[in-house]
Amino acid sequence: MCIRDSGLSLATLLYTLNFFIAAGILRVHYLTLVLVLSLFIYINELFLQNNRPFHNIAYTFLGLIYIALPFSLLPYFVMTVSGDVSGPVPIEGSEDILNYLLQPEHLIRFSPMLLLGFFIIHWIYDTGAYLSGRWFGKRKLFRRISPKKTWEGVLGGSLLAVMTAVLLSRWFHQTGMITWVMIALLIIFFGTLGDLTESMLKRKIGVKDSGKLLPGHGGFLDRFDGILLSVPVVFTWLQFMMR
C-alpha cells in the first residue's frame, strides 16, 4: 500500500471514529487506533527504501492534521448525547430514527443549527471581506503571501460576521448571543489565518489552484480554507464552555 492510500485510510478512520464518538457509541480512547496506525505508516515508509521517506511522511501527516482533522470534528457540532433513556423511545421523526439506529439506550440530540450557523458566519465573512476589499481596499494585509487581501476587506467582513452572529442568536435560541459572537470572532481571526496559510502553501508549491475541481476559483480547497483552522479552535472553545 502506498503512503497516499495509507493516509486516506487514516483520514477515513479518524472521521469514522469521531462520528461514532460524537454519537456516544464509542469512547474517546478508541482514537488511540489512529496513533497505532500512524506509527505503522511511519515505520512502513522508512523500510520501503523510497528516496524521500521523511518528506512523504511529513506531507501525509500534514494533510491529516490540516484537512482530515477539521472535517472529522464536524459531527460534534450536530450531535450530543444526553444520557440513558429508561423505557422505549417513541419514533416520530428523523431525529428519533437516528436515535434508534445509532444507540437506542441513549438520547442523541441531533441539531444542525450550530453547524449551519458556523458556515453562515464563515460565508458572510468571506463574502463581506471580498466585496469590502474590492470596493474600499487600499492597505495590504499581507502583500508577500496574498497581495489581494486588504485590511479594509477584513474590517468589512468582520462587521458583517458579527452582525450575522447577533441575528443568528435571535433565530437559533438554543445558543446565546455571546456564544455566537465569540464564534464569529474566532472565525474572523483563525479563518483569515487559514486563508493566508492556504495561499502560502500554493505559492510555495508554485500552483494557482489547489486542485482540478473549480479551476479558476483557487481549487476545491479554496472554498474551505477558512474553516480548516477555525473548526478545531471553535470546537475546543465550545468543549470548554460546555463543561
Where are these regions (language model features)?
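Short, conserved aromatic-histidine micro-motifs
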Residues: 178-181, 224, 243
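Juxtamembrane boundary at the C-terminal end of a transmembrane helix
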Residues: 236-243
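Membrane-embedded alpha-helical bundles of polytopic integral membrane proteins
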Residues: 4-150, 154-186
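Acidic (Asp/Glu-rich) catalytic motifs at the cytosolic membrane interface
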Residues: 120-138, 142, 151, 155, ...
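A general structural signal for short secondary-structure boundary/capping elements
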Residues: 165, 233-235
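Hydrophobic transmembrane alpha-helices of multi-pass small-molecule transporters
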Residues: 161-162, 230, 239
